[in-house]
Amino acid sequence: STSPFYPLFAALDVNAKMHEGQSGQRLWADCVRVGIEARKLLMKTCKYIKPFVPAQIDGKSWGDYPTDEIAQNLRFFEFEPTAKWHNFEGYGEHQYFVDPCKFLLTTPGIDAETGNYADFGVPATILANFLRENAIVPEKCDLNSILFLMTPAEDTAKMEHLITQIKRFEEFLDADAPLADVLPSIY
């Protein structure tokens, strides 16, 4: 087009300036820390929905490490070829890592160690629709995972609200609530 869209150019210029130098690094470092704290809170609060990170590092719970240590060390996000928490195969040491700015959660239903279906499961699409009914929109979901993209706009309050809603969803699971109560808009 010969007519540029000036609001878009202005937004790009502002974004570039915000991320210039140390300020951009600080914005994203804070985002990573918020994501780590959210994973820790989810581990403490919820029993069915889990963050997609190793449960333990060197025999110690992932969530028991200091946030800054986790943020500064990629081993907390590493796919180790022999690890069973993800059960992925066919890659080398230090080849793949979980992106700390992708808040990826798993729902029960597939045993990660064997790849077999578990006796109890919750399709992530049900959780996604529950969250949408409560004004939280996930980026995407599949059978047993749901993804939220972290940006510097996320803060502790937003993540705590998300986890509170996930905890509410788990309470519906424990109560074996009818789907009409969990997702009233479909009825």
Question: What residue spans do the PLM features occupy?
Answer:
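PLP-dependent aminotransferase class I/II
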Residues: T2-A16
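Non-catalytic terminal extensions of PLP-dependent enzymes
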Residues: Q22-Y187
